[in-house]
A protein has these predicted regions:
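Adenosine-nucleotide cofactor-binding segment
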Residues: 146-149, 161-221
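C-terminal capping/lid region of NAD(P)-dependent oxidoreductase domains
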Residues: 203, 233, 242-243, 289, ...
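NAD(P)H dinucleotide-binding glycine-rich loop of Rossmann-like/cofactor-binding domains
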Residues: 84-147
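C-terminal substrate-binding/catalytic core of Rossmann-like NAD(P)-dependent dehydrogenases/reductases
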Residues: 247-302
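Glycine-rich beta-strand-centered segment in the early N-terminal region that forms part
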Residues: 23-40, 49-91
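Hydrophobic/small residue at the entry helix of a nucleotide-binding pocket
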Residues: 128, 152, 176
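Helix-to-beta-strand junctions that scaffold the AdoMet/dcAdoMet cofactor pocket
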Residues: 226-228
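Short glycine-centered segments of the SAM/dcSAM-binding site in methyltransferase folds
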Residues: 143, 230-231, 259
Length: 335
């Protein structure tokens, strides 16, 4: 069967390519999935589209936030033919998907039929935010500063706020602060951030500072803004080189007794285990409930839904038009 896929060919260049997918002789851990929608994961994909991340070569097939229906499957796939599923794979109209033996590997989860498939493309963003929130020690009345109000930053801030914490979001892009407020975040600032944090924390620093940018200088801001015995959550993935004297940062961690927490998403089990529900399955259930109940209005995150052939302009907008561009979703139904 014919499949179309997004391919990054050079810095800032991408196009839609095609290939033939063999759909016969499926292994037990394989499935043929027809994609309906997929979301561009801006942080990860822009790092490759514009060569921010080092150590890879073009061409590259980006993407991992996919929603589609199973056409055929092997016996070990925990979903049925015809089921709507969220799965990890590069952007493509048709995918021969395979599980792996790693801690998580490629992920596939059955979606409830009342979940909007367009909104479900944001599932990975929810899973990242949920794991980050759950890794921190939270108490009622805690004050939280979330640095970076991209998609994951906004979701993380809203989740902390739902737990009853006082949360402030920080981003230099005014449009992102405005969007966060539209989605229900009470406090978001794009300038005079130190003054805002001092006012919120009575000058003592926040209990939890979250880096949702992956930018090393912002991690230093987190260390400076957190109180003594506070927590710094590294939710973004650092990719860009940054030269600095590390001693001041290490001194802050040491002198303030700060707990620094790494929050890479792929570190918890996929399935629930006896005595613990700290798993992707449980976070997936929570994310579906948040979407279903409109506790978090995912649609407001999505700037536009486009034909995948317009992929090059999509990456350009996400990189250079941050004020008006947030999440972008590909519509694959015509392919």
């Amino acid at each position: 069967m014919e499949s179309y896929f997004v391919e990054l060919t050079d810095i800032g260049r991408s196009h839609l390519n095609r290939e033939e997918i063999v759909t016969d002789d499926l292994k037990d851990d394989e499935a043929i999935i027809e994609t309906e929608y997929s979301m561009i994961s801006a942080g990860t994909e822009l790092s490759r589209a514009f060569a921010i991340k080092k150590g890879f070569q073009y061409p590259v097939r980006p993407g991992y936030c996919m929603v589609g229906r199973i056409l055929k499957k092997g016996k070990d796939i925990r979903a049925e033919e015809g089921d709507l599923v969220f799965f990890n794979a590069p952007h493509a109209s048709l995918v021969r998907w395979r599980c792996s033996d790693s801690v998580q590997g490629p992920l596939i989860m059955k979606l409830d039929e009342d979940i909007d498939p367009i909104e479900a493309t944001a599932m990975n963003l929810f899973l990242v935010a949920l794991q980050g929130v759950n890794l921190t020690e939270v108490k009622l009345g805690y004050r939280v500063a979330v640095y970076g109000l991209g998609n994951i930053g906004i979701l993380t801030a809203l989740m902390y706020q739902k737990l009853g914490l006082k949360v402030i979001g920080i981003d230099p892009v005014k449009g992102r602060c405005d969007l966060a407020k539209q989605m229900g975040l009470k406090y978001a600032v794009c300038e005079d951030t130190k003054e805002a944090i001092d006012e919120m924390s009575d000058g003592g620093g926040v209990d939890i500072a979250v880096d949702a940018t992956g930018l090393s200088p912002v991690i230093l801001d987190c260390l400076n803004s957190v109180r003594r015995y506070g927590q710094v959550l590294l939710l973004g993935s650092p990719r860009q080189s940054y030269e600095a004297d590390l001693t001041p940062a290490f001194s802050l961690i040491h002198m303030k007794d700060v707990k620094v927490i790494g929050a890479f998403n792929r570190t918890i089990p996929v399935h629930d285990t006896d005595g613990s529900n700290d798993s992707l399955e449980n976070n997936f259930r929570i994310a579906q409930e948040l979407m279903r109940n409109r506790d978090i209005d995912v649609r407001k995150l999505i700037s536009k839904i486009i034909d995948p052939k317009d992929c090059e302009s999509a990456y350009y907008d996400l990189m250079y038009r941050k004020e008006e561009t947030n999440a972008i979703v590909y519509d694959w139904r015509a392919y």
